[in-house]
């Protein structure tokens, strides 16, 4: 064992903090849920309409078995990335602190890596080049949801139908950018539909009923650039997708057809600590992952909600 390996101590308590930590504002996992893989590289299925094909399964007496065509299933090469951040704690800070600095360090480093993951998912999902022509729509000046007479319900229905005609299933997930959600809450068409509800205002739960999509998440996360300018990670867009729901306590696998997955190397995230120069404790969070959009036919991007 090398000297550095001896100095670094994997802390199971801090690692469990990192594993259990989630920020409610990060919703990328709704579109590309995390699944564990054994290695940092390899091949996994890429899902097209063939993955959602309805096969003839009835078999007559003494007839041949119905055979699937394995060539229907494509694959892509995957390579995962290591993400790590370390947080320094001076021994004097540790002595004077009124709260546990190690836990604060884990939370800060873990949230920063999760923010990076959220941005990676959002960039993939909101990139028009990720979709075929029939699976995306850029709203015109008269179609944008801030325009008088615009029809959000009709636009969403068209997107749902586009997915259904490609994969035979309706989308069960919708991600709405924060600024798009603000527009939807004030849209006359939606207010008219809920005017007799007890709440009287458009909420996510009411949108689930109006749009008939069981899982809706609003992307509230923001990030700051090098000049401390803040920007929404999720823009004025809506993403519809089919993402299989997790069944009970079963772990997800990358082999079930889905819009996308975030592939993570098994055993991550990990938190370790080491001492530098006798006066600094470095608390380091490491995660190995990469999001992949594997079934573009199972997604639909609506851009330009606010024009």
UniProtKB/Swiss-Prot annotation:
It comes from Burkholderia phage BcepMu (isolate -/United States/Summer/2002) (Bacteriophage BcepMu). It is found in: Virion; Host cytoplasm. Belongs to the lambda phage major capsid protein family. This is Major capsid protein. Keywords: Capsid protein, Host cytoplasm, Late protein, Virion. Its main location: virion. InterPro entries: Lambda_capsid_assembly. GO terms for cellular component: host cell cytoplasm; viral capsid. The keyword Transport does not apply. Assembles to form an icosahedral capsid.
